[in-house]
Amino acid sequence: MVGASRTILSLSLSSSLFTFSKIPHVFPFLRLHKPRFHHAFRPLYSAAATTSSPTTETNVTDPDQLKHTILLERLRLRHLKESAKPPQQRPSSVVGVEEESSIRKKSKKLVENFQELGLSEEVMGALQELNIEVPTEIQCIGIPAVMERKSVVLGSHTGSGKTLAYLLPIVQLMREDEANLGKKTKPRRPRTVVLCPTRELSEQVYRVAKSISHHARFRSILVSGGSRIRPQEDSLNNAIDMVVGTPGRILQHIEEGNMVYGDIAYLVLDEADTMFDRGFGPEIRKFLAPLNQRALKTNDQGFQTVLVTATMTMAVQKLVDEEFQGIEHLRTSTLHKKIANARHDFIKLSGGEDKLEALLQVLEPSLAKGSKVMVFCNTLNSSRAVDHYLSENQISTVNYHGEVPAEQRVENLKKFKDEEGDCPTLVCTDLAARGLDLDVDHVVMFDFPKNSIDYLHRTGRTARMGAKGKVTSLVSRKDQMLAARIEEAMRNNESLESLTTDNVRRDAARTHITQEKGRSVKQIREVSKQRNSRDKPSSSSPPARSTGGKTPVRKSSSSSFSKPRKASSPPEKSSKPKRKILKTVGSRSIAARGKTGSDRRPGKKLSVVGFRGKSSSARAS
């Protein structure tokens, strides 16, 4: 009885297997791979994973359902493969701040509008008036951190929306302080102070603050150098919430009693790297001293600090960490890297071309299209020469450098910004490389910068807030090494933080020394081989004769150094030619080495973008 039941069970199982084996032949698209299962795995699509075979068999007649099932199965298998990959281990040094910044970068992908960042309706109304809907990367990272009342450093490339990244949350925090703590607007007692290195940047930040003040309901004033003090004093005597200005002028108003520290709760240093690079450190310390003393009191709630920067070198970062202990660094993925929406062209000048004529040929196509162009020079003399040459060729220009008075610089910027004006070209120095929000289509570097940081600031004048731009650099012979290194770093999407002319030359010199050492070792080995080969007797010499009537033995390669051979020739005569040969060959190798060392040029060849599709060298010929 038991044997019969086993036979019936085996027949039923074999028939079922035979039936299922025929299904893939009838429906080829049902041929699925054998699923793989891993421990501790939770399927992405549980409904597809738990579907039984009878259900699939009953829905065979519905092709859409079968395609849907196959799609789910493929997704499940893809998820299995991804889960099987080992997780990438991060280095142990990357902890703390970088982990939190990476978390914020990941959450940035999920943020599609400003409402998800927790902004109030008042602030959202200001954004709607500005027609800004999607936050940038620095805004997704910075707004939540500032709203958590943390002291942070916001690092992102120029034109990425850093001003709104700190203004929006600070305005909302001031409104919350009014509701929770009963703080009100008072004369001469601002609650927020924004320090900027230049008057132009102060005016730019002030315009952004005024644009959102109508909906957010706060009052801001501008206090910067180059303007009369009396109107600023009258503005400070009114009820104020925010003061935007330069450090020197704000300290002057504090010393004269026009402004007090008592209610300052939020401090912003815009373009902090520029402030520390240009010697604003003593003024910043002088401004911070009363705030730090006030924060030591038991009843005081302290103040929140926000530093904003487009570049952050190691020296400036060390200084920031010393002055603002415990501050948190938040950086975007584009910091110290090229702007993705800008095209970078490097024109190599061999020395025979006229550099001013080359500049004119670069400008003509852009000016014919009606584009706005900025021409950067390293010195005042170079800027004057460019301005004079372009004026002689009927190209209207305006200047922006240190010798132009502040009021005249403002007028020149207005002429350059005017869409209907006749001054589409701005000839400037690095004074215009930072803090100016201009709609520039083309940036031309008549003089190549001395370091990569200045290159980044110059290129940041174009391709701002997602717009497209173009950057053209005229590279002379002395700047080719740095230009080649910058071009290589941008091609590999590397950071340009520590690239300077001195560093690149130092690295090239080290590489050259290493190559010369290797070449010297190789030449010494060749000399030793030649010496050994000359010391050996030629193959035509007669073989050594044996004594005592023994059978002669064929001479091997080592028999030339046998004792009978050495005895037949005096040692004095054999040693002198050796020294002479060694000395002659050595002097020849030293001369050859000196010749190759002088002819060799270190550095990588540039990819030349010539004028109008032709290389500059071909044009010169």
Swiss-Prot record:
SMART domains: DEXDc, HELICc. One of its GO terms (molecular function) is RNA helicase activity. The keyword DNA repair does not apply. PROSITE patterns: HELICASE_ATP_BIND_1 (PS51192), HELICASE_CTER (PS51194), Q_MOTIF (PS51195). Residues 143-330 form the Helicase ATP-binding domain. A motif (Q motif) lies at residues 112-140. It catalyses: ATP + H2O = ADP + phosphate + H(+). GO terms for cellular component: chloroplast. Keywords: ATP-binding, Helicase, Hydrolase, Nucleotide-binding, RNA-binding. The keyword Nucleotide-binding applies. GO terms for biological process: chloroplast rRNA processing; ribulose bisphosphate carboxylase complex assembly. Residues 555-572 have a biased composition (Low complexity). A motif (DEAD box) lies at residues 270-273. ATP binds at S156, H157, T158, G159, S160, G161, K162, T163. The Q motif is unique to and characteristic of the DEAD box family of RNA helicases and controls ATP binding and hydrolysis. This is DEAD-box ATP-dependent RNA helicase 39. It comes from Arabidopsis thaliana (Mouse-ear cress).
